[in-house]
Amino acid sequence: MPQPRQTQRARRGAPRGPSSRSKRAAILDVATELFGREGYEHSKWADVAAAVGIGSTALYHYFESKLHCLYEIMAEALEADREKFERISGEHADDFVEALRAVLEGAFDLTEHEVLRNRLLVSEQVLVGVHRTSQREEDARQLARQRTRDLEFAWATFLTRGMEQGAIPEADPRLLARAILGLYNSVFHWYRPRGGLELGEVADFYVERCLAVAGLPMDGAAAQARPKRAARSRTPARARSGQTATGSR
């Protein structure tokens, strides 16, 4: 029997719950926190569901597996890193050395959530090189792999410009890009938010060493004079709607 028009209109105007897109974002945020703090292998997929406030089986509506979720986290993080790199380097296009320093300092301007994300990227990078038989996992893996290459290419192109301008010595730009990124990424093997060192102290040390790898003289006095930067404690906007994993490892 057709329902009264008023009832149909009322139902159309009823408030809706969180969209699939926002729920997916919440899962990614919570998984980043949990995987980053506890370690990917030691984290339980069911704990992600509990923190988001959904049943374990509901996770499979968004991700085929815990590994599929990990690849998606990696792909999004790498894309964000590349966009941030291109934005900062573009803001200092007239002075390569200034741009290089700004890019390196910007790389350490991170929230605690982003630090955990970087820790996860570094610790599980090897999984990006392992072929998957599941099509969804393989597609996500290939995307993360391609975005790794895109970030390295952006760095190599940027460094080539510096060499062409005579700002840094000639070298293989791909190897130099990997050397700088490798030194930067090494921080996240050991750095922990709220540990013995502030992120600003780590940044002051590593920025100068990355500049030295590029062939520029270290400016220790300038590093000491710059104000210390600490990991920001702000919460990513999309994570505010859900709980975050707790505990440390």
Q: What are these regions, as identified by a protein language model?
A:
Residues 1-11, 106-113, 149-164, 181-183, ...:
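C-terminal peripheral helix-coil segments that are non-catalytic and often amphipathic
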Residues 2, 26, 30, 34-68, ...:
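Helix-turn-helix
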Residues 23-31, 48-49, 73-85, 155:
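Generic hydrophobic, amphipathic alpha-helix propensity
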Residues 37-41, 114, 165-166:
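Short coil/turn segments at alpha/beta junctions that flank glycine-rich nucleotide-binding fingerprints
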Residues 86, 131-165, 174-178, 201-204:
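Amphipathic alpha-helical packing segments from all-alpha helical-bundle domains
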Residues 112-139:
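Amphipathic alpha-helical segments used for helix-helix packing
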